[in-house]
């Protein structure tokens, strides 16, 4: 939630069910937000029970990101660029994807929570 409040987004962000977009391993918890507008901005934060599950979630997120980037490349090249520059990393058992132009703030907020 801190990401939605402190990072600059071009569109309004609304909570979504991460399970609609990713297959979540048993025992994991997730928070996700997507843009209400015509941007590809989004946030996925998935906390997994172990690093094996986190690796599987990261692969699934990469596939989602790749497919969105390919789609955006056809119709919204500026959004494809934003997707290519997304903050996307695993911190222990937590996988974070944040698509925004404000990557510096996103990285700072994430570091506060994951160390």
Segments predicted by a language model, with ranges:
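Soluble, non-membrane globular domain cores that form compact, hydrophobic packing
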Residues: 1-115
């Amino acid at each position: 939630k801190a990401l939605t409040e402190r990072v600059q987004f071009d569109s309004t962000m609304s909570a979504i069910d991460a399970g609609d977009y990713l297959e979540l391993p048993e025992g994991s918890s997730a928070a996700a937000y997507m843009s209400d507008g015509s941007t590809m901005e989004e946030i996925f934060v998935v906390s997994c029970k172990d690093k094996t599950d986190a690796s599987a979630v990261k692969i699934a997120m990469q596939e989602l990101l790749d497919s969105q980037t390919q789609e955006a490349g056809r119709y919204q090249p500026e959004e494809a660029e934003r997707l290519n520059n997304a903050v996307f990393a695993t911190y222990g058992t937590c996988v974070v994807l944040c698509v925004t132009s404000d990557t510096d703030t996103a990285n700072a907020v994430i570091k506060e929570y994951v160390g």
